[in-house]
């Protein structure tokens, strides 16, 4: 049986370093730079038509909503916005 101590290589935790890092997190701005506009209402409080309106505002800006990762609008998005938007809204309204 081996008596090797596998934890001997771990560095001790520096509590000062941890408090410095946590203060950076605590003082972070509420919205990161370049983040999409997030409506004041949460998704649970929004009606389906309000949510779709926010979604399409983001697509027209070239972003996915509610994701904060920028993405260029593709030709498929443009075609869907013309042909599919109405049927999508109608199908959601039927389900509500």
Swiss-Prot record:
Region Disordered, annotated ranges: 1-45
Transmembrane feature ranges: none
Biological process (GO), any one: symbiont-mediated suppression of host cytoplasmic pattern recognition receptor signaling pathway via inhibition of TBK1 activity
InterPro entries with a match to the protein in the record: ASFV_DP96R
Source species, domain of life: Viruses
Basic and acidic residues bias spans: 1-20
Keywords: Host-virus interaction, Inhibition of host innate immune response by virus, Inhibition of host NF-kappa-B by virus, Inhibition of host TBK1 by virus, Inhibition of host TLR pathway by virus, Viral immunoevasion
Region of interest (Inhibition of host cGAS-STING-TBK1 signaling pathway), ranges: 30-96
UniProt record similarity statement: Belongs to the asfivirus DP96R family.
Protein role: Inhibits cGAS-STING-mediated type I IFN expression and NF-kB activation by inhibiting TBK1 and IKBKB/IKKB. Inhibits host TBK1 phosphorylation.
Protein name listed in UniProt: TBK1 inhibitor DP96R
Organismal lineage: Viruses, Varidnaviria, Bamfordvirae, Nucleocytoviricota, Pokkesviricetes
